[in-house]
């Protein structure tokens, strides 16, 4: 067997093959973006008929029916109550983020909500650095700065007063980022299915308590029932399908597919709710996406090179 040839300068090293495109992964991602769009539209429809917190309660009730099917299989893991304080903290943050996001969906153009939601990778990086000690690369710092510019383009502070609901959506993206960091820590001791079951079991009483305090229960109309089913089922399917996509396909391919949510929801908002298609919102969304995608792609490439040479 010939002796291995020493690696030459970095520029002479053979290029790594591009990540493979998986047909199954693409289909899973299309299911995910369809679920997120369905959840937003159903939330908008229900927000005209009932309080936001009631939407979250009904969403959790649908989730509880699904969790009941999983509970017998997961009971041995559930009864150990491992890391319960972390589950509780994660769901307090996630519940608040869901409330802010749903309120944003009710009050803002849907495309603006989705554009601002794409700032979540910024918050994940910052919270992972603060809570888990993960290193923030220079390109990630640059992505955070450019993403902030994209946020300013979306919000257009010079064009008048910023809608407070837009700040709520930014806060929800931060909350989802913090929740993702909690999930990253929880996966050391709990399966994804158990994390989802705990989410339903904890967030349902949170919603019921808040609903009792506000006294805002409104009896659903028959026309609301399909939207209740959609908002509950898509809340589960959106995250499940994305997890399945990322299991079989590189994130650098999956995330651009997910970004199609922004132009698609802009068209739906225009057709269904007469929302104008804003060039500033779309351009700002592209800036936010491009910054985070470039950083993610560079970091993934660095990891692949490290594995290839290690």
PLM regions and their residue ranges:
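Membrane-interface interhelical linkers
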Residues: 1-34, 64-89, 138, 201-229, ...
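C-terminal-most transmembrane helix of multi-pass membrane proteins
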Residues: 2-8, 263-310
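Hydrophobic/small/kink-forming positions within alpha-helical transmembrane segments
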Residues: 33-41, 68, 91-99, 121-126, ...
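Specific transmembrane alpha-helical segments of multi-pass solute transporters/efflux pumps
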Residues: 35-38, 75-112, 153, 233-248
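Transmembrane alpha-helical segments that form core, pore/gating elements
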Residues: 37, 41-44, 52, 67, ...
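C-terminal transmembrane-helix exit sites in multi-pass transporters
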Residues: 103, 120-142, 263-282
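Helix-helix packing/entry segments at the starts of transmembrane helices
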Residues: 113-119, 186-202, 239-270
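Hydrophobic transmembrane alpha-helices of multi-pass small-molecule transport proteins
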Residues: 139-155, 172, 280-299
């Amino acid at each position: 067997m010939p002796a291995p040839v020493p690696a030459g300068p970095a520029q002479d090293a053979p290029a790594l093959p591009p990540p493979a495109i998986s047909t199954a992964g693409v289909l899973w991602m299309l299911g995910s973006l369809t679920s997120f769009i369905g959840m937003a539209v159903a939330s908008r429809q229900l927000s005209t008929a009932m309080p936001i917190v009631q939407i979250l309660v009904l969403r959790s009730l649908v989730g509880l029916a699904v969790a009941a099917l999983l509970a017998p299989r997961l009971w041995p893991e559930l009864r150990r109550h491992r890391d319960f304080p972390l589950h509780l903290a994660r769901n307090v943050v996630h519940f608040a983020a869901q409330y802010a996001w749903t309120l944003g969906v009710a009050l803002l153009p849907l495309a603006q909500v989705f554009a601002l939601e794409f700032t979540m990778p910024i918050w994940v990086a910052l919270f992972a650095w603060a809570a888990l000690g993960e290193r923030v690369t220079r390109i990630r710092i640059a992505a955070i700065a450019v993403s902030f510019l994209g946020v300013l383009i979306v919000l257009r502070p010079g064009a008048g007063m910023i809608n407070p609901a837009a700040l709520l959506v930014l806060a929800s993206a931060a909350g989802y980022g913090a929740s993702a960091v909690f999930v990253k820590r929880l996966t050391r001791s709990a399966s994804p299915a158990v994390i989802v079951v705990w989410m339903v079991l904890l967030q349902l009483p949170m919603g019921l308590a808040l609903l009792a305090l506000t006294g805002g229960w409104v009896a659903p109309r028959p026309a609301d029932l399909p939207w209740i089913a959609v908002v509950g089922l898509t809340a589960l399917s959106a995250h499940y399908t994305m997890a399945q996509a990322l299991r079989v396909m590189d994130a650098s391919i999956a995330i651009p597919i997910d970004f199609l949510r922004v132009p698609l929801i802009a068209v739906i908002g225009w057709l269904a709710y007469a929302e104008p298609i804003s060039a500033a919102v779309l351009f700002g969304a592209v800036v936010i996406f491009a910054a985070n995608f470039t950083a993610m792609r560079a970091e993934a490439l660095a990891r692949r090179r490290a594995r290839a040479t290690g």
